[in-house]
């Protein structure tokens, strides 16, 4: 930090450095417009299925159902794929359930003419050997798959670092931050994302589909991460009524009332 800065200028300097190092996408072009195959990966309970449904709904509202494909690898757990199937039925998009690399290759071949394919993966603890198997399965297909890691904003910095390093495998294309509505602080998550040089695509702050997913707005995220809460003396805390201002533009959910009424853990 430069010497002889006033407190106000020092804070401004810190914000500018954080903004310079926090890599985010500016709009939906990199996902919904550009298209491709995207796999949402991460530990159990981080919100992968709901986030996949939110992205699917966001795509349908912008481009329609014809060129969207949905795949779930959660075929082993009893009822594991049913949640995404319900969303798929509402959206009018068939969900393909796969259980191994061979199934995945078949499903991708069937969907090869789709503009965008979203893959919801089974949740695996970062310390489970199945993580390596899952990454290998996603890496050994005939189509390039972009791997987006879902990070729980309520987790500690140590846990998030552990998750990222376990799932990195042959490389991550980016991440999404989930459960912002449950987090007392987002400083840990932002710190780890910056240190691990991950691109932050979206943030999710609730269970509603498709409303509760937003493009990450780095200026607001940093501003609120640096706030101190006088009542709790905790850094990086922001209030629930501030959440809408932390995010980028939300989608217009006027045509998704059916989805809005659905809520899953």
What are these regions (language model features)?
Residues 1-68, 72-75, 86-87, 91-93, ...:
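Primarily NTPase-proximal linker/entry elements flanking Walker-type ATP/GTP-binding cores
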Residues 49, 74, 84, 120, ...:
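Residue-level signature of catalytic and energy-coupling elements of molecular machines
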Residues 61-63, 88-91, 109-113, 139-143, ...:
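Conserved catalytic network of the ASCE P-loop NTPase/AAA+ motor domain
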Residues 67-69, 143-151, 168-183, 187-205, ...:
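Conserved beta-strand/loop subsegment of P-loop NTPase cores
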Residues 75-78, 102-103, 123-126, 153-157, ...:
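Conserved nucleotide-binding/hydrolysis micro-motifs of P-loop NTPases
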Residues 80-81, 126-134, 159-161, 186-188:
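Conserved ATPase-coupling elements of RecA-like P-loop NTPase cores
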Residues 109-116, 130-154:
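Inter-motif core of Ras-like GTPase G domains
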Residues 193-265:
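NTP-binding/hydrolysis catalytic cores, primarily Walker-type P-loop NTPases
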